[in-house]
Amino acid sequence: MELQRRAFLRAGASGLGTIALKSLLRADDSAAVAPHFAPKAKHIIFLHMLGGPSQVDLLDPKPALARFEGKPMPDSILKGKQFAFVPKDAGALASPYKFAQFGESGTWFSELMPHLAERADDLTVVRSMQTDEFNHGAGELFIHTGFGRLGRPTFGSWVSYGLGSLSDSLPTFVVMASGPNASGKSAWGSGFLPGVHQGVKFRSGEEPVHYLANPEGVNRDRQRQVIDGVSALNRLARERYEDPEIATRIAQYEMAFRLQASGPELMQVESEPQHVLDAYGAKPGDGSYASMCLLARRMVERGVRFVQIMLRGWDHHTGIYRPNALPRSCRLMDRPTSALIDDLKQRGLLDETLVIWTGEFGRTPMVQAISPQGFTQDPGRDHHKDGFSLILAGGGTRPGLTYGVTDDFGFEPAENPVHVHDLHATALYLLGMDHTKLTFRHQGRDFRLTDVHGRVVKDLLA
C-alpha cells in the first residue's frame, strides 16, 4: 500500500504539464504516423451546408431544364435511380436565377452567390460529385466518414490520427454548428480510433466549451494540482489495465486545462479590426456562421488542423425559391465564406489551408411538388446523390478550374465523375498522406477513410 502511495506521489509531483501530449499519445500507439510525402496543405476547413444545396440553382447552369419544364426526365436517365420523396415521373424544374461567367477563368455562378463569384479565380468548382447515400443521416455520415452507417471515424479524426497536432493548447479537430444535424455527434466522432481524435464541439460565444472557467475560489495553480493528481491516478490505472482510452482521458483533462488559458483569447473576435468584422459580417458573440468563419481563420492561425463548420438551412423540399429559403441560405453563407477565403489569402494561409464547401448531396433537377399547385406556386427539389457540385479553395488545388460535366439536365456526370471517396483521397494527398496507407487495425482488418475505394484526382491539383 505504501509503495503504491509513493508511486502516486511521484507521478503527481512530476505533473502532466511537464509531459508533451504528443509523447503521451505516442506511448499508446495512437499518435501521428507522419506524412508519407511532402504536404501542400497543413489545415482543412470543411464547410458543410447541411441539407444539400441545389447545384442547378447555384453552380451548374442547365438551360435544357427550361426547354423541358414540367416534362418527365427520359427513362434512360432515371432507370435504376433512387430518390427520397419525388416520383420518377416528376417534371423538370428550371432555375429562375440568372447565371454569368466571372473572372479570367470564366467560372459560372448564379446571382445568389455574388461574393463567391467575385473570387472565381481563387476557387475550384467540381460539378461532377457523387455519393452513395440520398438521406440526410446516412449522407452526412458518408461525406464525413466514407461510410453510410454508424461506427466509422470521421475525416477530421483520420487527419488527427495521421498527422497529430500543431498546437499544444488547442484541439487538433474542432467543430462548430449552427444547430442540430441528422447524424448527431457521429459527424465528428472518432469511431474505432482512440477517442482523443474525436472532434471537440465549440460554441461561438465567449465560452467555447462548458465549464471553461474555474469555480469561484479555485485559482489556476490549484486547478493545476487537481489535474496533476487526477492524471497521476489515471496513469496508474493505465499501467494496470492497459486500456488506451485511459490515455485519452488523461489527454482530455490536460487539453481542458490548457483551453482555460487559450480558449478565451481565441474567442475574442472583438479584438479583430473593425474592417475585418465588417468583411465577414460578424458580431462578437452572436453565434452566426459569419463568426464561425472568422473563428475558423483564428483557429488555423493558432494551429488547429481541422475545422468543421456545419450550416443548416439547405433542405428545400418545397418553397425553395421563397425569400426565406434558398435566397436566405445563400445570403447567410456567401459573404462570410468569401471573406474567409480573402482573409486566409491576405495572411498567407490559403496556400496551406484547404477549404472545402459542400453539402452531403445535391438536389434533383426535377420538381418536388407537395400539392397539385406546388409546381407553379411553391416548388421544391428532392435529395440527389448522383450529381452535385462543390467548391475547393487553397491547399494546393488549381484555382480558376471548373472540373467535371453533368448531362444536359444536371442529373449525373457525363465527364470526369468524382466520388466522395475520391474527394477524401485527394484531400489526404494534399496533406501529405497516401489514403491507401493511412490505416487502423480494428477487429482483424485494416480500415481506412476511403475503405477499398478512392483515387487522387490529379487534375484538381495545382
Report each predicted region and the residues it spans:
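Ligand-binding pockets and gating/stacking loops
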Residues: M1-A462
